[in-house]
From Swiss-Prot:
The species this protein was found in: Xenopus tropicalis
Protein name: RNA polymerase-associated protein CTR9 homolog
Ranges of biased composition (kind: Basic residues): 965-975, 991-1001
Cysteines paired by S-S bonds: none
Compartment list: Nucleus speckle
Sequence ranges of Polar residues compositional bias: 1068-1093, 1105-1134, 1149-1159
Entries under SMART domains matching the protein: TPR (SM00028)
Biological process annotations from GO: endodermal cell fate commitment; negative regulation of myeloid cell differentiation; negative regulation of transcription by RNA polymerase II; stem cell population maintenance; transcription elongation by RNA polymerase II
Composition bias, Basic and acidic residues: 1032-1042, 1160-1172
An example Gene Ontology CC term for this record: euchromatin
Length: 1172
């Protein structure tokens, strides 16, 4: 069946040439016909495509290349055909470039395609087919993915269902790891055209694998195989899924699928690499190498080539062909993507084999970056960095190994590696790590602990000072090494030697030098070249003071190793200890001349210290001193350049600065060094020296004392001398003397100490002698110390150390002591005289004190006797008064009539008003009734009525208020010894107007006749206390504090006396009155009271007469008024009571005055009654 034909019009005629597709002539013949007939371009393109379909690619290329030049463009829309011609040819070149293996040819094809696409851009830039072709070309180049994405996006905006654009977007999304997006594009393309080729299903399968949807991936790969049984990609995908199941049947199926794919396409690199991987685990390394090499040469994809190289490298690695393995590992890392780190792991192992730890670390760091918690990588890196000299890397190693031990706590190797790292910085944790490793070995591995670990644990205990534990582990290590020596005698004998050396060092620490020396010599008998033993024997001899023996041992070490730096350093230190600066300097210079030790830090520091020491020697050559300063400074700087953290070099620079006079800068340097570490004693001493130079003596003293406490278990005479110097400069000579004496106990033969002691004694004695206030004992002691200082200076001026101080200075000081001693007798005499005067003065003072003391004792005794006498007298008076009061109360009780008792009982709470009708004794007045006088006074002040009516009204009002809180009238105290005038008895009181401050008082009438005066005593003067102080008086006044509101000052004692009498006769009053509150109480009087009362009643009866009725009515009305007034005045009464307390001093009146006051008050009461 004919596939068709094409007609070629003949020029200038209506005839055509028909070419059958099944019988196409040669390309050149067709091209000549087309050129001759000036055929239009679209016919050229159609013929070219037909040639391409018939796989006649050469004719296809010739035809399209000729059409670009000779095609007829004289027709409508020729631009689109022109663009199609260029795009078609460019697409062919792109396809060829994808298949080309040769890089140069591939590059040439890509260049031609780029040129054709650029020409097509100039014709029609935004044609869909043109854009699709150009986007596919950008995908092939790889680095223009974003540009291709933009072109696919542009096409999809114009035609959303364009399948090539959808597939291109899916490819781009997959490469950008947007697997869901890629799957969506594939699905859309499949929905748009369900008859898509198998490649679409293959792409979907890859997306499903990346999304971990393995079942759907399996279905997609299966569907692709259904559509195209020769789809190699689908076969490989299914094979990988089967192999990852890790089951025997699945692995077998996977290998069969790979074999089928290999049969279909033997050059497919993916198939070849997977087969190589399979045969590697089958240990068929020859097939691995053949397949991987074949795969490497059949692909230009670098990821595929990296996989092929890796397969080749590990096959050579397992065959121990490390050179070939290194070559292919390295080549694989050049091709590998960032995520493919297996070649770096193998390459790192090859670098370790070659001893290149730096490159090995870099390789494993790349692996760890991709897989941060990979156990093997962290362990290897930890081991590599553990052996590094860089502290930062050691810290990284410690971090990695800690993570390893956390992930796998039973990894013994990791614990041992971690312990070895911690040995330098954290001994305690290192011991803990070794302990864990030991426990794992014994409990889980069921193995003996290696002698190496036992030795290391012992060394750590030795460093911690646990010498007993260290000895136990060293001995255990020796026993274990002897047991293991049966298997590897040479190795374990070497371990035994090391452990024996450590044990000898331990015996040194235990001060068992004999045992230590024996072990060192035993080692030297078996191993004469063990240099460290010679050095330790020399150091022991040096510490004993045997410098010559020490030098011999060090020279023995030099015979074994002529350039041993430690031996030369120890010999140099011997010279420096003897202050042989020149020979010592030469030894350290020799070390620095050797190429291997030309930057030896210890030797350079020693040289700097030598130059610094020369600055301490007295010299007048300033140029030489400056030269030495500069040399020392240059050496210290060189050390810091080699080791920026060397604290000793920084300390040396500070010392040089101090010598140059830059004290402040030197102090800053020392302070920084001390901040970095507080374990260098020289820094503390240098800071203290700086403080002395700055005259901060207190700070210097504190620094010296702290240095002594921190660094020197025993007294260090040098530091004690520094401390004494600081104390001397700050004037604390006594403390300075004590420090120097302490140093003399340590070094009694030190002439410098002797000189300083003598100087301090001289200064102290001088101060004491010049002080005129010094006592005799101090002066005598000063003279004694001055004589001692004189002897010291005389001795030192003859046999002193010329190298340490000037002997002439000692002689000068001796002469000065002699001069002071010549003046000592004057000072002694002056002090003795002063001492005698002071003794006399003290004796006189003591005598005066004794007299004064005796006088005080006598006065105190007299006072005590007087107080006893007064107390006795008061007690007698009180007893008399109590007896008289008791008699009086008994007499008054007999005089009362039953009617009066009844009236008193009935008026207890309320009224209590009396009239003459009630009986003859209703008007009877006793001392208690003066409580009724206070309201009487109020009445007169308020209403201005007569005293008689006011008195009755006041009496009724007072009893109407009830209770014992009756207002009392204060009376003026009569003059001492006065009996009262007759006018007071006859004359009635005149009412007065009340003044703001001064009130007129009615005349007082005596109730007691003169014959009774002196017989009634007030109880106010009787006190239970031993003295009559104000406090006791105040207590007596408080008992009647609330009684008198506006009374005068003389009322206080009367009220107190009455209150006290009431308290003495409670039982009688309770029996005689009903409620006891309103009944009048008996007045304390003598036996003659009854006559006076009778006389008073008779006179009242005669005078009152007919006025009784009117008076009685007035009393009734006045009583009610007074009740209300008394109630309204209660606050005033309270204030009056406060004022009344100020008058309590009246209680001091003598008994006679109290008797007169009582009689006057009685007369006053009678007078008021008579007026009624």
């Amino acid at each position: 069946m004919s596939r068709g034909s094409i007609e070629i019009p003949l020029r200038d005629t209506d005839e055509v040439i028909e070419l059958d597709f099944d019988q196409l002539p040669e390309g050149d013949e067709v091209i000549s016909i087309l050129k001759q007939e000036h055929t239009q371009l679209h016919i050229w393109i159609a013929l070219g495509l037909e040639y391409y379909k018939q796989v006649k690619t050469e004719d296809f290329v010739k035809l399209l290349e000729a059409a670009r030049i000779d095609g007829n463009l004289d027709y409508r829309d020729h631009e689109k055909d022109q663009m199609t011609c260029l795009d078609t040819l460019a697409a062919y070149y792109v396809q060829q470039a994808r298949k080309e293996k040769n890089k140069d040819n591939k590059k040439e094809l890509i260049t031609q395609a780029t040129l054709l696409y650029t020409m097509a851009d100039k014709i029609i830039m935004y044609d869909q087919n043109h854009l699709l072709g150009r986007a596919c070309f950008c995908l092939l180049e790889g680095d223009k993915m974003d540009q291709a994405d933009a072109q696919f996006h542009f096409v999809l905006n114009q035609s959303p269902n364009n399948i090539p654009a959808l597939l291109g977007k899916a490819c781009i999304s997959f490469n950008k790891k947007d697997y869901r997006g890629a799957l969506a594009y594939y699905k859309k393309a499949l929905r748009t055209n369900p008859g898509c080729p198998a490649g679409v299903r293959l792409g979907m399968g890859h997306c499903f694998v990346k999304l971990n949807k393995l079942d759907k991936a399996r279905l997609a790969f299966g569907r692709a195989l259904d559509l195209n049984p020769t789809c190699v990609g689908a076969l490989v995908g299914l094979a990988v899924l089967e192999l990852n199941n890790k089951e025997a049947d699945s692995i077998k199926n996977g290998v069969q699928l790979l074999s089928k794919a290999y049969t279909i396409d033997p050059s497919n690199p993916m198939v070849l690499n997977h087969l190589a991987n399979h045969f590697f685990f089958k240990k068929d390394y020859s097939k691995v190498q053949h397949l991987a090499l074949h795969a490497f040469h059949n692909t230009e994809v670098e990821a595929m080539q990296a996989e092929s190289c890796y397969q080749l490298a590990r096959s050579f690695h397992v065959q121990e062909d490390y050179d070939q393995a290194f070559q292919y590992y390295y080549q694989a890392t050049q091709f590998a993507a960032a995520s493919f780190v297996l070649p770096f792991f193998g390459l790192g192992q090859m670098y370790i084999y070659r001893g290149d730890k730096e490159n090995a670390s870099q390789c494993f760091e790349k692996v760890l970056k991709a897989y941060p918690n990979n156990y093997e990588t962290m362990k290897i890196l930890g081991s590599l960095y553990a052996a590094s000299d860089d502290q930062e890397k050691r810290d990284i190693a410690k971090s990695h190994l800690k993570k390893v031990t956390e992930q796998y706590p039973d990894d013994v190797e990791a614990w041992i590696e971690l312990a070895q790292i911690l040995e330098q910085t954290d001994i305690q944790n290192a011991l803990s790590a070794y302990g864990t490793a030991t426990r794992i070995l014994q409990e889980k591995v069921q193995a003996d602990v290696p002698p190496e670990i036992l030795n290391n644990v012992g060394a750590l205990h030795f460093r911690l000072g646990n010498l007993g534990e260290a000895k136990k582990y060293f001995l255990a290590s020796l026993d274990r090494a002897k047991a293991e020596a049966e298997h590897d005698e040479h190795y374990y004998n070497a371990i035994s030697v090391t452990t024996t050396y450590n044990l000898a060092r331990l015996y040194e620490g235990l001060c068992e030098f004999h045992e230590s020396e024996k072990l060192y010599k035993n080692i030297l008998r078996e191993h004469p070249n063990y240099v460290d033993c010679y050095l330790r024997l020399g150091a022991m001899a040096r510490d004993k003071g045997n410098f010559y023996e020490a030098s011999d041992w060090f020279k023995e070490a030099l015979q074994i190793n002529q350039d041993h730096p430690d031996a030369w350093s120890l010999i140099g230190n011997l010279h420096l200890a003897k202050q042989e600066w020149g020979p010592g300097q030469k030894k350290f210079e020799r070390i620095l001349k050797q190429p291997s030790t030309q930057n030896d830090t210890y030797s350079m520091l020693a040289l700097g210290n030598v130059w610094l020491q020369t600055l301490h020697q007295p010299t007048r050559d300033r140029e030489k001193e400056k030269r030495h300063q500069d040399r020392a400074l240059a050496i210290y700087k060189q050390v810091l350049r080699n080791d920026s953290k060397n604290l000793y070099a920084a300390n040396g620079i500070g010392a040089v600065l101090a010598h140059k006079g830059y004290v402040r800068e030197a102090r800053d340097v020392f302070a920084q060094v001390r901040e970095a570490t507080a374990d260098i004693s020289d820094v503390w001493l240098n800071l203290a020296h700086i403080y002395v130079e700055q005259k901060q003596y207190i700070s210097a003293v504190q620094m010296y004392e702290n240095c002594l406490r921190k660094f020197y278990k025993h007294q260090n005479t040098e530091v004690l001398l520094y401390l004494a110097r600081a104390l001397f400069k700050c004037g604390k000579l006594q403390e300075c003397k004590q420090i120097l004496l302490k140093a003399r106990h340590v070094a009694p033969n030190d002439t410098v100490l002797m000189f300083n002691v003598a100087l301090v004694l001289q200064r102290l004695a001088t101060l004491v002698l010049k002080d005129e206030k010094s006592n005799l004992k101090a002066v005598l002691n000063a003279v004694k110390e001055l004589e001692l200082a004189h002897r010291y200076f005389n001795y030192l001026s003859k046999v002193g150390d010329k190298m340490r101080f000037d002997l002439a200075l000692a002689a000068s000081e001796a002469r000065q002591c002699s001069d002071l001693l010549s003046q000592a007798q004057y000072h002694v005499a002056r002090a003795r005289k002063q001492d005698e005067e002071e003794k006399e003065l003290r004796a006189k003072q003591e005598q005066e004190k004794e007299i004064l003391r005796q006088k005080l004792i006598k006065e105190q005794e007299e006072k005590r006797l007087k107080e006893i006498e007064e107390q006795k007298k008061l007690l007698e008076q009180r007893a008399q008064y109590v007896e008289k009061t008791r008699n009086l109360l008994n007499f008054t009780g007999e005089m009362e009539t039953p009617k009066e008792k009844k009236q008193r009982g009935g008026g207890g709470g309320g009224g209590g008003r009396r009239s003459k009708k009630n009986g003859e004794f209703d008007e009877f007045v006793n001392d208690d009734s003066d409580e009724d006088l206070a309201p009487r006074k109020k009445k007169r002040k308020k209403g201005g009525g007569s005293s008689g009516s006011g008195g009755e009204q006041g009496e009724g009002g007072e009893e109407g208020e009830g209770g014992e809180k009756k207002k009392k009238k204060r009376r003026k105290r009569p003059q001492k010894g006065g009996d009262g005038s007759d006018d007071d008895e006859d004359q009635a009181p005149q009412p007065k107007k009340r003044q703001p401050k001064k009130r007129e008082k009615p005349a007082k009438f005596e109730r007691t006749p003169p014959s009774m005066k002196g017989k009634i005593k007030s109880k106010a003067i009787i006190s239970s206390s031993e003295d009559d102080s104000d406090e006791d008086k105040l207590k007596i006044a408080d008992e009647g504090h609330g009684r008198g509101s506006n009374s005068d000052s003389d009322e206080g004692p009367r009220t107190q006396a009455k209150k006290r009498i009431m308290s003495d006769s409670d039982s009688d009053n309770a029996n005689k009155s009903g409620s006891g509150a309103g009944s009048p109480q008996k007045s304390p009087q003598s036996d003659g009271d009854s006559d006076n009362n009778a006389w008073a009643r008779k006179r009242r009866r005669q005078d009152s007469g007919s006025d009784n009725d009117s008076a009685q009515s007035r009393r009734s009305s006045g009583g009610s008024d007074n009740e209300s007034r008394a109630a309204s005045r209660s606050p005033e009464s309270q204030r009056g009571s406060d004022r009344g307390s100020d008058n309590e001093g009246s209680a001091r009146a003598s008994p006679n005055e109290s008797e007169q006051e009582a009689s006057n008050n009685e007369k006053s009461d009678r007078g008021s009654d008579d007026s009624d």
